[in-house]
Every structure is written in C-alpha cells, then in structure tokens.
Amino acid sequence: MRIAILGSGVIGTTYAYAFQKAGHETYHILREEKIAAAPAKITVHLLDGRCNPKGEEKDDEYRVSLAEAGDTFDFIIISVAGGKLSDAIKTIKSRDIKGPLILFCNFWNERKQVEEILGDSEYVTAFPTAGGHIQDGKLNCVLFDHIMLESGSKARISDYAALVSLLNSADIKQEIPHDMFEWIWIHMAINAGVTSTAAREGVIDDPNRLARELMGDSKALTIAVRAIRETVKVVEARGADLRLYKNELLPYRIPAGIAGIAMKKLFAGNELTSRIMTLHNDVNDIMYGCKCVYDEGKKRGLELPLFYGNMERIFTNLDGRKLV
C-alpha cells in the first residue's frame, strides 16, 4: 500500500518505519519551507514490543520519501499536537493530496467538532501506543504490539478491512474500545492526573527526570491514583459512561496504596512501559492535555482539590509561558 505521513514527527515516523519494513511505500507530506531540509534517511533505535513482550532492541535505518502535490494514498496518518488538527487538514488540502485519514491525535474535541474540521474527508480515529524523540537525525522510539482503533461501525472510511490488513501486515494488533473519542478523553484525564502529580512541586521543565522519579516512588504513585480518580470525573461529566471502560480504569479503582505499590513494580519490571514514560519530553504537548482537563473541570464546577492544587502550582511557576 501507499501510506502518507503528515510531517516528520516521532509517532508518524515510527509507524512509517514499521509499515516500510512490512513492504509498504511510505511518503511524508511536508510544508514547502521544510522540503529542502528533509533528510534522505533517518537512523532508528527501536525498542520493539510487537513480538517480544519485554521488547527487542533494534538499530536500523528508515528511508525518507516525500509526497508530491496531487498524490493519492491508501491512507494518510495524521499525528499532530493538541489543537492543531485544523492546520494539518489545511496543509493536506493545499497540496491537493487525497486519501482516507488515520487520526493519531490527542484531542479534547467532541466528534461533531472534529467532523466539522474534516469536512467530507474519510477518516478513522485511532490512538498510537508508541513514543520517543528525534534528535540530530536519529529516531529513538518505543513501539508496542497494538493500537487503539475505532470500530468499523463508527469509522467513516469505505475500506476498513484494508486498514486492518495494513496493521496486521506490520504485526500491529487492534484493540477496539466502546467509543474512541471517549477513550482518548479518558487517556488524557489519566495523563493529566499523572503529570500533575509528577510536577506537584510546580516545576515541569524536565519531564524525563519527573517521570523517572515518579515511577520509582510508590507514595507518589499513590497520590497519582487519587488524582486520576478526580480527573476521570471530568470525562464522566462530559457524558461518558465509565462502566464501559472497566479495563482502562480498574487499576485506579483498587485501594490507592496498593495501586501505588503495584504500579512501581510494573514500571520496574516492564522496560517498554517505563521507557515510553521517559521519552516524551514535549512540555507544550504534555500541558495541552492537563489544561484541557483543568479548564473543563472548572467550567463544570467540579470539585477536584488535589488535581487543581497541583496544576495551579504548575501554572504559577510557568509564569505566563505559552503552553500551546
């Protein structure tokens, strides 16, 4: 298949690498001003969890090809920072590039709002289980064995089976939640609870260090569980039935102290999970989700004292810096 990736970010490039290794053609859609600086190849260091649950370290290269104006693709992957979906669609349309869209995005939007941005484009909402960073032409990333994927009945694409075939060809399984939008909101709420706890002293400039300290501290993880219990109330207030997401929320329903100890053991014994926690260092992207949850909770008049207190210390120390 011919797969396009908007931009050259970590998530899109990680999955592009996996698809290219599976025999598919991959192309990057870049803005005109970035085309000249695009590399011909990227060095890849991957902790690959697709075949080995503990992960397998791999070193390889990824060949970079560029999409041209007017091209048509089997699928186009869009993975952009929160709030930037509209600009992403404008970039694709300005190049007259066509194909069904795979949305690998954090967004706090309602489905109707996203569809207003997309217009008549075919699309499916999904969520990656990968992460990392690109620096000096080297991609250092983690790839799990599955993605979260909207069900065929809710996806707005004409060939859902082709998408499943693409994913299977790259050994990427699919987990299908009740509703992909609500699942993303829950994911953002959980992350907001974790982030607000890790940075509860008010400093968030070094996410890598904060993640390492949090994962090794069962008492801090206990606080995180309590914060998550607050933040998921925001998703419930938006109309989501949390009973439909028992698997996602079960770890936060057991006694917080026990959950904190269990989470510390999980991080210590699972390199895939612990490494992905430390590789995400984009403060603006991290804070986007936190701010969405905070603002929604305030708007709805919810009592979330632990979460609000942590976030307000962070906001104070950010001292008006631009977040998104």
In which residue ranges do the predicted regions lie?
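NAD(P)+-binding Rossmann beta1-loop-alpha1 motif at the extreme N-terminus of oxidoreductases
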Residues: 1-55
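Helix-loop-beta segment of a Rossmann-like dinucleotide-binding subdomain
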Residues: 138-148, 201-213, 269-280
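Rossmann-like NAD(P)(H) cofactor-binding subdomain of soluble oxidoreductases
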Residues: 55-139
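Hydrophobic anchor at the start of a short beta-strand
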Residues: 3, 25-27, 101, 123, ...
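Active-site-proximal catalytic alpha-helix in oxidoreductases
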Residues: 181-211, 219-232
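NAD(P)-dependent Rossmann-like dehydrogenase/reductase catalytic/cofactor-binding core
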Residues: 225-324
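Rossmann-fold dinucleotide-binding core
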Residues: 110-189
